Amino acid sequence: MTINFVTEKVNLRVNGRVATIEINRPETLNALDTDVLKGLVCKLKEISESDEIDIVVLTGKGKAFSSGGDIKTMLSNRDDRNFFPVMDCISELIMTLYSLPKLTISAVSGAAAGLGFSMALATDYIIADKTSKLAMNFVGIGLIPDGGAHFFLEKRLGETRAKQVIWDGKMLSADEAFELGLIQEIAEGDLQQALEARINDWLSRPTQAMIKTKKIMAEKNRPQLLKVLELEKYGQQKMRETIDHHEGIRAFIEKRKPNFIGK
């Protein structure tokens, strides 16, 4: 269980009926290590038990929403005994976030990449500033998306376009992501002002009815998302053993283009 896990890498602020969870690793562009994953689950479960909170905002401190999984954690978890607990933690985070009995908003500034993008897709609404860059870029290091990305992308795009986004691994501008239907809103001016406008609009609505609709859809989709998370976990294990993945990691560290061979 991750309840009562304490870390300075995740901040929680509550203002009336709105809670804001902030990833606090600006020096790594809010990369997601095990402490952050556990901290996010802890804060979300704490919020889920509050009858006073209706809206949860997920954001990152500094210049990025989240650059994705921490590459140092990835390199240190070559052993499956370390890998599977991390993947289970990711699954717990995504299931908790997706089924949270609150209205959830991702406020994206800067990069939302890899697992960071998957996490944003698990929320009900994504608002991004015009300078944001969003990427499902696992393929660049010979991996598959995780964090339920196969589920969320197919829901938003359909199977054909979801596969294309995954296979391309392209960095998308906010405009491109909006055109595809991956995000719901681009802040025309200040992100915080646009976020507050969205929050105030929702607070003026019957939020309990909105949350009930969310609960029904989340419960209906729960078995499918759980299955996707399981398939991603074991699929990722296989990809970690490939020559292409090891080449992708080396190329990333050496800041060069990878030479993939399909093995």
Predicted regions and their residues:
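Acidic, divalent-metal-coordinating active-site segment for phosphoryl/phosphodiester hydrolysis
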Residues: 169-176
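Terminal low-complexity tails and localization/encapsulation signals of metabolic enzymes
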Residues: 2-5, 250-263
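Glycine- (often His-adjacent) and acidic-residue-rich active-site loop
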Residues: 49, 59-96, 112
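Conserved CoA-thioester-binding segment of acyl-CoA-metabolizing enzymes
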Residues: 1-61, 95
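C-terminal long alpha-helix characteristic of the crotonase
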Residues: 127-132, 183-230, 237-243, 259-263
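CoA-thioester-processing core
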Residues: 93-98, 107, 113-166, 180, ...
